[in-house]
Amino acid sequence: MMFPSLLAPPAVYPNLLRPTPTLTLPQSIQTALSNHTSFLIEDLIRISRPAGFLPRAVPPPSMSPPTSESPNCMSETSDLARREGPNQTSISSNNSSPFLKFGVNAILSSSPRTESAQVLLPSAHPKPFTFPYFEGSFQPFIRSSYFPASSSVVPIPGTFSWPLVARGKPRRGMLRRAVFSDVQRKALEKMFQKQKYISKPDRKKLAGKLGLKDSQVKIWFQNRRMKWRNSKERELLSSGGCREQTLPTKFNPHPDLSDVSKKSSGEGEEEPLCPGNSPAHALPYQCPEHHLRLDTQLPSSPFNSSSASKPSDFSDSEEEGGEQEEEITVS
Protein backbone atom coordinates (compact mmCIF):
# COMPACT_ATOMS: atom_id res chain seq x y z
CA MET A 1 0.00 0.00 0.00
CA MET A 2 1.28 3.42 -0.88
CA PHE A 3 -0.33 5.46 1.90
CA PRO A 4 -0.91 3.36 5.02
CA SER A 5 -1.49 6.40 7.18
CA LEU A 6 -4.70 7.33 5.36
CA LEU A 7 -6.54 4.18 6.49
CA ALA A 8 -5.04 3.77 9.94
CA PRO A 9 -6.11 6.23 12.69
CA PRO A 10 -3.43 8.56 13.93
CA ALA A 11 -1.70 7.86 17.21
CA VAL A 12 -2.77 11.14 18.78
CA TYR A 13 -6.57 10.64 18.31
CA PRO A 14 -7.13 6.88 18.34
CA ASN A 15 -10.94 7.13 18.73
CA LEU A 16 -11.56 9.71 16.03
CA LEU A 17 -12.03 7.30 13.14
CA ARG A 18 -13.14 4.31 15.20
CA PRO A 19 -16.52 3.07 13.90
CA THR A 20 -19.51 2.72 16.19
CA PRO A 21 -20.45 -0.74 17.57
CA THR A 22 -23.56 -0.85 15.40
CA LEU A 23 -21.48 -0.58 12.21
CA THR A 24 -18.98 -3.32 13.05
CA LEU A 25 -21.33 -6.17 12.12
CA PRO A 26 -20.82 -7.91 8.79
CA GLN A 27 -23.17 -7.14 5.93
CA SER A 28 -24.85 -10.57 6.09
CA ILE A 29 -25.70 -10.20 9.78
CA GLN A 30 -27.04 -6.68 9.22
CA THR A 31 -29.32 -7.83 6.43
CA ALA A 32 -30.52 -10.76 8.56
CA LEU A 33 -31.30 -8.43 11.43
CA SER A 34 -33.09 -5.99 9.14
CA ASN A 35 -35.22 -8.75 7.59
CA HIS A 36 -35.92 -10.46 10.92
CA THR A 37 -39.36 -9.56 12.24
CA SER A 38 -39.23 -9.43 16.00
CA PHE A 39 -41.23 -7.56 18.59
CA LEU A 40 -38.42 -7.10 21.06
CA ILE A 41 -37.87 -3.61 22.37
CA GLU A 42 -34.31 -3.50 21.10
CA ASP A 43 -35.29 -4.53 17.58
CA LEU A 44 -38.16 -2.06 17.44
CA ILE A 45 -35.95 0.77 18.68
CA ARG A 46 -33.18 -0.19 16.26
CA ILE A 47 -35.57 -0.38 13.29
CA SER A 48 -37.51 2.81 14.03
CA ARG A 49 -34.45 4.91 14.78
CA PRO A 50 -32.97 6.65 11.72
CA ALA A 51 -29.32 6.66 10.88
CA GLY A 52 -28.79 10.19 12.09
CA PHE A 53 -29.85 9.31 15.63
CA LEU A 54 -27.48 6.40 16.08
CA PRO A 55 -25.17 6.98 19.03
CA ARG A 56 -21.68 7.91 18.10
CA ALA A 57 -18.58 7.49 20.18
CA VAL A 58 -17.21 10.86 21.21
CA PRO A 59 -13.46 10.83 21.77
CA PRO A 60 -12.36 11.92 25.23
CA PRO A 61 -10.36 15.13 25.14
CA SER A 62 -6.70 14.65 25.94
CA MET A 63 -5.33 16.86 28.66
CA SER A 64 -1.72 16.84 27.43
CA PRO A 65 -0.95 18.48 24.10
CA PRO A 66 0.63 16.31 21.43
CA THR A 67 4.38 16.37 21.66
CA SER A 68 5.65 14.17 18.88
CA GLU A 69 3.77 14.22 15.58
CA SER A 70 4.62 14.61 11.97
CA PRO A 71 3.28 17.44 9.80
CA ASN A 72 1.85 14.88 7.40
CA CYS A 73 -0.38 13.34 10.09
CA MET A 74 -1.62 16.76 11.19
CA SER A 75 -2.51 17.77 7.67
CA GLU A 76 -4.28 14.47 7.02
CA THR A 77 -6.37 14.69 10.17
CA SER A 78 -7.30 18.30 9.45
CA ASP A 79 -8.37 17.36 5.92
CA LEU A 80 -10.50 14.49 7.22
CA ALA A 81 -12.10 16.74 9.84
CA ARG A 82 -12.90 19.32 7.15
CA ARG A 83 -14.47 16.63 4.98
CA GLU A 84 -16.57 15.11 7.75
CA GLY A 85 -17.65 18.44 9.28
CA PRO A 86 -20.08 19.63 6.58
CA ASN A 87 -21.37 16.10 5.99
CA GLN A 88 -22.29 15.60 9.64
CA THR A 89 -23.92 19.02 9.93
CA SER A 90 -25.97 18.46 6.78
CA ILE A 91 -27.11 15.01 7.95
CA SER A 92 -28.07 16.25 11.39
CA SER A 93 -29.96 19.24 9.94
CA ASN A 94 -31.80 17.05 7.44
CA ASN A 95 -32.72 14.47 10.05
CA SER A 96 -33.75 16.89 12.77
CA SER A 97 -36.04 18.93 10.56
CA PRO A 98 -38.73 16.29 9.70
CA PHE A 99 -38.97 14.87 13.26
CA LEU A 100 -41.10 16.55 15.89
CA LYS A 101 -39.88 17.44 19.33
CA PHE A 102 -42.23 14.99 21.03
CA GLY A 103 -42.25 12.35 18.32
CA VAL A 104 -41.32 8.72 18.78
CA ASN A 105 -37.94 9.12 17.12
CA ALA A 106 -37.11 12.19 19.19
CA ILE A 107 -38.09 10.41 22.39
CA LEU A 108 -36.12 7.27 21.51
CA SER A 109 -33.07 9.20 20.42
CA SER A 110 -30.16 9.48 22.81
CA SER A 111 -28.30 12.63 21.77
CA PRO A 112 -30.94 15.32 22.48
CA ARG A 113 -31.96 13.84 25.79
CA THR A 114 -28.42 13.45 27.02
CA GLU A 115 -27.56 17.01 25.98
CA SER A 116 -30.58 18.44 27.77
CA ALA A 117 -29.80 16.36 30.83
CA GLN A 118 -26.26 17.64 30.83
CA VAL A 119 -27.53 21.21 30.60
CA LEU A 120 -29.99 20.76 33.47
CA LEU A 121 -27.66 18.76 35.68
CA PRO A 122 -24.12 19.82 34.91
CA SER A 123 -22.75 18.52 38.20
CA ALA A 124 -24.44 15.10 38.09
CA HIS A 125 -22.18 12.51 36.51
CA PRO A 126 -24.07 9.25 35.95
CA LYS A 127 -22.22 6.10 36.74
CA PRO A 128 -21.84 3.42 34.08
CA PHE A 129 -24.82 1.09 34.02
CA THR A 130 -23.89 -2.57 34.08
CA PHE A 131 -26.92 -3.90 32.21
CA PRO A 132 -26.39 -3.86 28.41
CA TYR A 133 -30.13 -4.07 27.71
CA PHE A 134 -30.76 -0.38 28.35
CA GLU A 135 -29.50 2.06 25.76
CA GLY A 136 -28.64 5.70 26.09
CA SER A 137 -32.28 6.81 25.90
CA PHE A 138 -32.97 5.29 29.33
CA GLN A 139 -29.96 6.83 31.02
CA PRO A 140 -31.82 9.94 32.32
CA PHE A 141 -34.19 7.66 34.24
CA ILE A 142 -31.34 5.74 35.88
CA ARG A 143 -29.50 8.63 37.42
CA SER A 144 -28.52 9.36 40.98
CA SER A 145 -31.63 11.52 41.48
CA TYR A 146 -33.86 8.44 41.24
CA PHE A 147 -31.60 5.74 42.68
CA PRO A 148 -28.99 5.82 45.45
CA ALA A 149 -25.67 7.15 44.28
CA SER A 150 -23.78 4.37 46.05
CA SER A 151 -25.27 1.61 43.90
CA SER A 152 -24.23 1.24 40.28
CA VAL A 153 -27.04 -1.15 39.40
CA VAL A 154 -30.79 -1.15 39.88
CA PRO A 155 -31.46 -1.82 43.58
CA ILE A 156 -33.55 -4.73 44.74
CA PRO A 157 -37.26 -3.85 45.08
CA GLY A 158 -37.06 -4.69 48.77
CA THR A 159 -34.76 -1.70 49.31
CA PHE A 160 -37.38 0.87 48.26
CA SER A 161 -39.18 2.75 50.97
CA TRP A 162 -42.69 2.57 49.49
CA PRO A 163 -43.39 -1.10 50.42
CA LEU A 164 -42.50 -0.22 54.02
CA VAL A 165 -45.46 2.15 54.38
CA ALA A 166 -47.59 1.26 57.40
CA ARG A 167 -50.43 -1.05 56.37
CA GLY A 168 -52.70 -0.27 59.27
CA LYS A 169 -51.99 -0.59 62.95
CA PRO A 170 -48.71 -2.26 63.90
CA ARG A 171 -49.14 -5.74 65.23
CA ARG A 172 -48.79 -5.96 68.97
CA GLY A 173 -45.84 -8.06 70.03
CA MET A 174 -46.49 -11.23 71.96
CA LEU A 175 -45.57 -11.15 75.63
CA ARG A 176 -42.91 -13.56 76.69
CA ARG A 177 -43.77 -16.16 79.28
CA ALA A 178 -42.93 -14.93 82.75
CA VAL A 179 -40.95 -17.19 85.07
CA PHE A 180 -42.08 -16.87 88.70
CA SER A 181 -39.94 -17.71 91.68
CA ASP A 182 -41.07 -20.04 94.45
CA VAL A 183 -41.83 -17.13 96.79
CA GLN A 184 -43.93 -15.39 94.16
CA ARG A 185 -45.77 -18.59 93.28
CA LYS A 186 -46.58 -19.35 96.92
CA ALA A 187 -47.86 -15.82 97.51
CA LEU A 188 -50.03 -15.96 94.40
CA GLU A 189 -51.40 -19.37 95.36
CA LYS A 190 -52.19 -18.15 98.87
CA MET A 191 -54.11 -15.17 97.48
CA PHE A 192 -55.92 -17.44 95.03
CA GLN A 193 -57.13 -19.67 97.84
CA LYS A 194 -58.59 -16.60 99.56
CA GLN A 195 -60.35 -15.20 96.48
CA LYS A 196 -60.53 -16.67 93.03
CA TYR A 197 -61.37 -13.34 91.38
CA ILE A 198 -58.96 -10.71 92.63
CA SER A 199 -59.95 -7.05 92.45
CA LYS A 200 -57.88 -4.37 90.73
CA PRO A 201 -56.64 -2.65 93.92
CA ASP A 202 -55.64 -5.97 95.46
CA ARG A 203 -54.02 -7.03 92.22
CA LYS A 204 -51.95 -3.86 92.00
CA LYS A 205 -50.99 -4.15 95.64
CA LEU A 206 -49.94 -7.77 95.23
CA ALA A 207 -47.98 -6.99 92.06
CA GLY A 208 -46.08 -4.20 93.79
CA LYS A 209 -45.37 -6.42 96.78
CA LEU A 210 -44.00 -9.27 94.67
CA GLY A 211 -42.17 -7.07 92.17
CA LEU A 212 -44.33 -8.12 89.22
CA LYS A 213 -46.36 -6.29 86.62
CA ASP A 214 -50.10 -5.89 86.91
CA SER A 215 -50.59 -7.77 83.63
CA GLN A 216 -48.49 -10.70 84.87
CA VAL A 217 -50.62 -11.11 87.99
CA LYS A 218 -53.79 -10.80 85.92
CA ILE A 219 -52.68 -13.47 83.44
CA TRP A 220 -51.56 -15.77 86.26
CA PHE A 221 -54.98 -15.58 87.93
CA GLN A 222 -56.72 -16.24 84.60
CA ASN A 223 -54.64 -19.34 83.96
CA ARG A 224 -55.05 -20.52 87.55
CA ARG A 225 -58.83 -20.13 87.39
CA MET A 226 -58.91 -22.16 84.19
CA LYS A 227 -56.96 -25.01 85.79
CA TRP A 228 -59.13 -24.87 88.88
CA ARG A 229 -62.34 -24.92 86.80
CA ASN A 230 -61.16 -27.90 84.78
CA SER A 231 -60.34 -29.87 87.93
CA LYS A 232 -63.71 -29.03 89.50
CA GLU A 233 -65.51 -30.03 86.33
CA ARG A 234 -63.87 -33.44 86.46
CA GLU A 235 -64.89 -33.82 90.11
CA LEU A 236 -68.48 -32.78 89.37
CA LEU A 237 -68.79 -35.08 86.40
CA SER A 238 -67.43 -37.97 88.42
CA SER A 239 -69.89 -37.25 91.27
CA GLY A 240 -72.87 -36.90 88.92
CA GLY A 241 -72.97 -33.10 88.60
CA CYS A 242 -73.04 -30.89 85.52
CA ARG A 243 -70.55 -28.48 84.00
CA GLU A 244 -72.84 -25.43 84.21
CA GLN A 245 -72.32 -25.23 87.97
CA THR A 246 -68.73 -24.08 87.48
CA LEU A 247 -69.55 -21.32 84.99
CA PRO A 248 -70.39 -17.79 86.16
CA THR A 249 -74.04 -16.82 85.71
CA LYS A 250 -76.13 -13.69 86.24
CA PHE A 251 -77.15 -14.72 89.73
CA ASN A 252 -73.76 -16.18 90.63
CA PRO A 253 -71.05 -14.27 88.76
CA HIS A 254 -68.21 -15.71 90.87
CA PRO A 255 -68.92 -19.35 91.59
CA ASP A 256 -66.93 -20.83 94.44
CA LEU A 257 -66.57 -24.59 94.07
CA SER A 258 -63.76 -25.13 96.50
CA ASP A 259 -66.05 -27.29 98.74
CA VAL A 260 -67.72 -29.34 96.03
CA SER A 261 -66.75 -32.67 97.57
CA LYS A 262 -67.98 -31.57 101.02
CA LYS A 263 -71.27 -30.32 99.59
CA SER A 264 -71.87 -33.53 97.69
CA SER A 265 -71.14 -35.65 100.80
CA GLY A 266 -73.44 -33.45 102.96
CA GLU A 267 -76.28 -33.84 100.49
CA GLY A 268 -75.85 -37.62 100.57
CA GLU A 269 -76.19 -37.63 104.37
CA GLU A 270 -79.28 -35.40 104.35
CA GLU A 271 -81.17 -37.50 101.80
CA PRO A 272 -82.70 -39.98 104.35
CA LEU A 273 -83.91 -37.04 106.47
CA CYS A 274 -85.80 -35.34 103.68
CA PRO A 275 -89.03 -37.44 103.97
CA GLY A 276 -89.55 -36.57 107.65
CA ASN A 277 -88.65 -32.90 107.33
CA SER A 278 -90.66 -31.86 104.26
CA PRO A 279 -92.66 -34.69 102.75
CA ALA A 280 -94.87 -32.30 100.81
CA HIS A 281 -91.93 -30.66 98.90
CA ALA A 282 -90.02 -33.86 98.33
CA LEU A 283 -89.49 -34.83 94.70
CA PRO A 284 -89.44 -38.41 93.44
CA TYR A 285 -85.86 -38.22 92.07
CA GLN A 286 -84.60 -36.70 95.35
CA CYS A 287 -86.38 -39.04 97.85
CA PRO A 288 -87.13 -42.38 96.19
CA GLU A 289 -87.63 -44.21 99.53
CA HIS A 290 -90.33 -41.79 100.61
CA HIS A 291 -92.08 -42.29 97.29
CA LEU A 292 -92.11 -46.04 97.83
CA ARG A 293 -93.48 -45.60 101.35
CA LEU A 294 -96.32 -43.47 100.02
CA ASP A 295 -97.16 -46.16 97.50
CA THR A 296 -97.33 -48.81 100.22
CA GLN A 297 -99.56 -46.63 102.41
CA LEU A 298 -102.02 -45.82 99.66
CA PRO A 299 -104.57 -48.66 100.44
CA SER A 300 -105.09 -47.41 104.05
CA SER A 301 -105.88 -43.83 102.99
CA PRO A 302 -109.45 -42.55 102.62
CA PHE A 303 -108.85 -42.05 98.92
CA ASN A 304 -108.07 -45.71 98.57
CA SER A 305 -111.14 -46.73 100.59
CA SER A 306 -113.38 -44.61 98.45
CA SER A 307 -111.80 -45.99 95.35
CA ALA A 308 -112.19 -49.49 96.72
CA SER A 309 -115.86 -48.87 97.50
CA LYS A 310 -116.52 -47.56 94.03
CA PRO A 311 -116.54 -50.94 92.26
CA SER A 312 -119.06 -52.29 94.86
CA ASP A 313 -121.34 -49.33 94.20
CA PHE A 314 -121.17 -49.99 90.52
CA SER A 315 -121.98 -53.66 91.11
CA ASP A 316 -124.97 -52.80 93.33
CA SER A 317 -126.38 -50.42 90.80
CA GLU A 318 -126.00 -53.00 88.10
CA GLU A 319 -127.85 -55.59 90.19
CA GLU A 320 -130.70 -53.15 90.89
CA GLY A 321 -130.95 -52.35 87.23
CA GLY A 322 -131.13 -56.04 86.45
CA GLU A 323 -133.95 -56.56 88.94
CA GLN A 324 -135.89 -53.66 87.45
CA GLU A 325 -135.50 -55.14 84.02
CA GLU A 326 -136.72 -58.47 85.29
CA GLU A 327 -139.70 -56.83 86.91
CA ILE A 328 -140.55 -55.07 83.69
CA THR A 329 -140.44 -58.25 81.74
CA VAL A 330 -142.54 -60.15 84.28
CA SER A 331 -145.32 -57.61 84.34
From Swiss-Prot:
One of its GO terms (molecular function) is DNA-binding transcription factor activity, RNA polymerase II-specific. Its main location: nucleus. GO terms for biological process: cell differentiation in spinal cord; regulation of transcription by RNA polymerase II. It is found in: Nucleus. Residues 173-232 bind DNA. Residues 315-331 have a biased composition (Acidic residues). Residues 299-314 have a biased composition (Low complexity). Keywords: Developmental protein, DNA-binding, Homeobox, Nucleus. The keyword Cytoplasm does not apply. Residues 56-94, 232-331 are annotated as: Disordered. GO terms for cellular component: nucleus. Residues 256-266 have a biased composition (Basic and acidic residues). The keyword Nucleus applies. Belongs to the H2.0 homeobox family. PANTHER family: DBX, HOMEOBOX PROTEIN DBX1. May function within the midpoint progenitor population to inhibit neuronal differentiation, possibly through modulating the function of Xash3. This is Homeobox protein DBX1. It comes from Xenopus laevis (African clawed frog). The gene is dbx1.
